[in-house]
A protein has these predicted regions:
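Acidic, metal/ion-coordinating pockets
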Residues: 3-6, 24-27, 31, 36, ...
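Short, low-complexity, disordered segments immediately C-terminal to signal peptides
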Residues: 45-67
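N-terminal Lys/Arg-rich, disordered targeting/topogenic segments
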Residues: 1-20
Length: 469
């Protein structure tokens, strides 16, 4: 037997099965691809501060540290404030008493060429007049000239040379009052010519007007303050269709509406008429009102009940200052309170007396000397940035007419003296004799006895008002 060795046949090795591994790897790659795609697509990246995501986060069981909270910064809000109220202007008005041109006052003014000049009468008071922003005087005479049949004359029918207006203007006066009981002393001629002469001298006037179309008042703008001024006089006729001045001078039909008048016993009628005119003045821009009024009883140093009622009516209508005339003597000053508006007050000087006249003690039945006394009444208005206008200050300067004969000309001089208590030596300042110095001192005392208390009341009230820069 043959030995033959047959190696046993080896089975080929079993190939590894990679299919499961490939499947797993494919699955992993698929997952990674999805994640990669998610990351690469805008808007799909998780936001750390997304409140929606945060709300789905499972809280940990351990202690956590809160992230610092950012508090938003608040920007302060600026609250607008009103600008402070400040004074933006003042206006001072001066008013003097009656310019009552008796013939003894007229004659010394005549010059060699026939013209008239009364400048020496105002020489000492001129600086005080000029210190005001605006000055007013009551012209108690007419200016009819002499060509129309009227001579120059004094009481009872006054007609004065035109030179009195020129002299008043040169002394610093800006306005003349033309409504008084002597307005019609030279009838129609004097009524209109007086207004014409005043206008030709570049001065204002109130109380009368040249035609129906003209205003019955004047709005004067002084340092940016619009001050309304109006002038009334009493009349003596009860007939509503007539106007009678001085007890016998009936104005013609076409003239009766050209003067501001009132009946003494008709306070309501006066109030109604004044209210209408004040409404017009305010519509024209008046920010303050001054009433100049010819009223009262001659030679009475105390105002009467009718004056009191009329003053109260004017106060109730909002008038700021009342300047009275006609009695030819000084009457008291008073502070009135409105009965319709307790916040409104009115300063009232019932009479400024005589600025210039021949009513001397020697000529008068009244021997007290009061007819020789006058006042330069100064009052100031202040205007503020909020539009308010109010009376700010009031001053009274007593005046006295010193009658003497000039050594240079030999003529009489009616010298209006400002009795300023700041002047230590009146005798030297005004070249007075011992006798005339005594008279001046008595005049000052008479005046202050009448107005001193009321003046103090007014000044105390004004001083009590809240100060404004």
């Amino acid at each position: 037997m043959s030995d033959t060795y047959e190696r046993p046949r080896r089975r080929p090795p079993k190939k590894p099965n990679y299919k499961p591994l490939i499947a797993v790897m494919a699955a992993v790659l698929a997952i990674l691809s999805v994640v990669a795609i998610a990351i690469s697509v805008p808007g799909c990246t998780p936001r750390q501060n997304d409140p929606t995501l945060q709300s789905t986060t499972t809280p940990t069981t351990g202690p956590t540290t809160s992230a610092p909270t950012t508090v938003p910064t608040t920007v302060p809000t600026t609250i607008p404030t009103e600008p402070p109220v400040v004074k933006i202007g003042t206006a001072t008005v001066a008013a003097t008493g009656d310019i009552l041109m008796h013939m003894p006052c007229v004659r010394p003014g005549k010059q060699a060429d026939g013209s008239y000049d009364f400048a020496p009468y105002f020489a000492h008071v001129q600086d005080y007049v000029l210190s005001a922003d605006y000055a007013v005087a009551n012209l108690e005479t007419t200016l009819a000239g002499t060509d129309g049949g009227y001579p120059y004359s004094g009481y009872p029918n006054f007609n004065c040379p035109d030179g009195i207006v020129t002299s008043l203007k040169n002394a610093g006066f800006d306005m003349l009052l033309t409504a008084n009981n002597h307005t019609y002393d030279t009838q129609t001629l004097g009524f209109f010519r007086t207004q014409q002469v005043i206008a030709e001298n570049g001065m204002d006037h109130i109380g009368t007007k040249p035609d129906a179309e003209s205003d019955s008042y004047k709005i004067v703008e002084i340092n940016g303050i619009r001050i309304g001024m109006i002038n009334y006089t009493y009349e003596t006729h009860s007939d509503p269709n007539k106007v009678d001045l001085n007890g016998g001078a009936d104005l013609k039909e076409n003239e009766k509406t050209l003067i501001n008048v009132f009946l003494k016993d008709d306070v309501e009628g006066f109030k109604t008429d004044l209210a209408e005119k004040l409404a017009d003045m305010r519509a024209d821009g008046a920010e303050a009102i001054v009433l100049y009024i010819h009223w009262g009883e001659e030679y009475q140093t105390k105002h009467n009940s009718q004056q009191k009622k009329m003053a109260q009516a004017a106060c109730d209508l909002g008038v700021d200052v009342i300047v009275g005339g006609h009695p030819h003597v000084i009457q008291p000053m008073e502070l009135l309170e409105s009965e319709t508006d307790p916040t409104h007050k009115t300063v009232c000087l019932y009479s400024t007396g005589n600025a210039l006249s021949n009513q001397r003690i020697a000529e008068m039945r009244l021997k007290t000397g009061h007819t020789e006394d006058g006042i330069l009444f100064s009052f100031s208005f202040a205007k503020y940035s909020d539009g308010t206008v109010r009376v700010e200050n009031v001053e009274l300067l007593p005046t006295w007419v010193n009658l003497y004969t000039s050594k240079q000309t030999g003529k009489k001089v009616y010298d209006i003296l400002p009795l300023d208590d700041q002047i230590e030596d009146w005798k030297t300042q005004f070249e007075l004799t011992d006798s005339t110095l005594t008279q001046a001192e008595k005049s000052y005392d008479r005046t202050m006895k009448i107005v001193g208390e009321g003046l103090q009341t007014v000044q105390n009230y004004l001083a009590s008002l809240p100060p404004v820069a």
